[in-house]
Amino acid sequence: MLVVKKTPKINGILNAPPSKSYTHRAVICASLANGLSNLKNPLNGADCLSSAHACEMFGAEIELSDEQWVIRGSELKTPDNIVDIGNSGTTLRILTGISSQISNGYTILTGDDSIRKRPMQPLLDALKQLGIESFSTKNNGTAPIVVKSGKISNNVVEIRGDMSSQFITSLMMTLPFSENDSKIVLTTPLKSEPYLNITIDVLDKFGVKIEKNEEKNKLGYKIKGNQRYSPCEYIIEGDYSSASYLVAAGVLLNSDIVIKNVFKNSKQGDREIIEIVKKMGADVEINEDNVKITGPYNLKGIEIDVTDIPDLVPTIAVLGCFAEGKTVVYNGEHVRIKECDRLAACTLELSKMGAEIEEKKDGLIITGVHKLNGAKLKTYHDHRLVMAFTIAGMLADGETIIEGEDSVKISFPDFVDKMKSIGSNIEVI
């Protein structure tokens, strides 16, 4: 458990952790490239390590260290055992597609209790359109998933754009193996597009080209066939999702902090956290590779479309508690199918602290109360809730006890140490 007490001031310079999204994609691309790749500044978090270990089961040789991962990619081989991806939905979804391209046999992919509840059917349906056999062992669209090796036999695949961008990323990373050019056609408006921009960016660095396309008012992507992944040296940038908690702490508390390793021109959608706090009234200084914050600021409630930024919702919910007026979060139906139902969880748990939150079908309405009280909070094994609730606890009267703090190892392994280094009054017990 994490014990959080009111924190009068924070100050210091700290690095944002490396990007989880970039690390996942880069290690998988490197494993598919014949030759030696070097990933510098990777995220040594549980989810990304799941991707690395899974790639080893498909034949890659990977040397892991804190500063870099050295990866010798090879032709895909059939795993000798069941591929257990732990709690990483990204790993499960990308490798479900990729595993269809082993030369022979079957792949079985599974994960922990949480992963075995995450929806997979849209991806399985898409693979079926491509002529790939895959199925849920429970016949309910969840892991364990069985995938049979096979050639891609159809050139067009249709998939919803409003479920999970990870399904589309999986197709983007699999279709270059096709002997023919392919198209992905989105049948509904796209959500979380920045994550697909990250996928396209990483693929490009490894020699694979994806072209955005629109036909008959439907967005989609074109992928050339017979493409080959090429090894490279790749530097992982800092993670704006994880930096959002540092930004929130900076604008809400008496602060003087510099957050390094976050880039002004990043393709990450969650860089929007900077614009959000600015619109709420914070005078944040954004430089080429860092953010400087001297708080606190008097924030005002605003309306925020979270179509492309679902991971920022817990952070926004906490900011809204201390803003004047109402903060409205909308277009967030997909936030319900993350590690947990984050809309319901934020409503229930922050209400225990005295927050005024109304849960809507696609979002939240938060009325600023300016003052929260310490409480015992559940986090449902969700790393983003742990970190967002920690910031709330640092401003609350009394003591806040947060369960499940171990989940931060997924995306921000040294979160507690870094927060303590700038003066946060938190302890693990």
Swiss-Prot record:
Entry keyword annotation includes Transferase: yes
Keyword Ligase: no
Active site, UniProt feature: 311
Binding site for phosphoenolpyruvate: 20, 89, 118, 166, 342, 384
Pathway(s) where this gene product acts: Metabolic intermediate biosynthesis; chorismate biosynthesis
Pfam families (UniProt xref): EPSP_synthase (PF00275)
EC numbers on record: 2.5.1.19
InterPro entries xref list: Enolpyruvate_Tfrase_dom, Enolpyruvate_Tfrase_sf, EPSP_synthase, EPSP_synthase_CS, RNA3'P_cycl/enolpyr_Trfase_a/b
Gene3D superfamilies: Enolpyruvate transferase domain (3.65.10.10)
UniProt KW keywords: Amino-acid biosynthesis, Aromatic amino acid biosynthesis, Cytoplasm, Transferase
GO terms classed as biological process: amino acid biosynthetic process; aromatic amino acid family biosynthetic process; chorismate biosynthetic process
Protein location: Cytoplasm
Molecular function GO labels: 3-phosphoshikimate 1-carboxyvinyltransferase activity
Cellular-component GO terms for this entry: cytoplasm
Residue numbers binding 3-phosphoshikimate: 20-21, 25, 164-166, 192, 311, 338
Reactions catalysed according to its record: 3-phosphoshikimate + phosphoenolpyruvate = 5-O-(1-carboxyvinyl)-3-phosphoshikimate + phosphate
Function: Catalyzes the transfer of the enolpyruvyl moiety of phosphoenolpyruvate (PEP) to the 5-hydroxyl of shikimate-3-phosphate (S3P) to produce enolpyruvyl shikimate-3-phosphate and inorganic phosphate.
Subunit (UniProt): Monomer.
Family that this chain belongs to: Belongs to the EPSP synthase family.
Protein name as it appears in the record: 3-phosphoshikimate 1-carboxyvinyltransferase
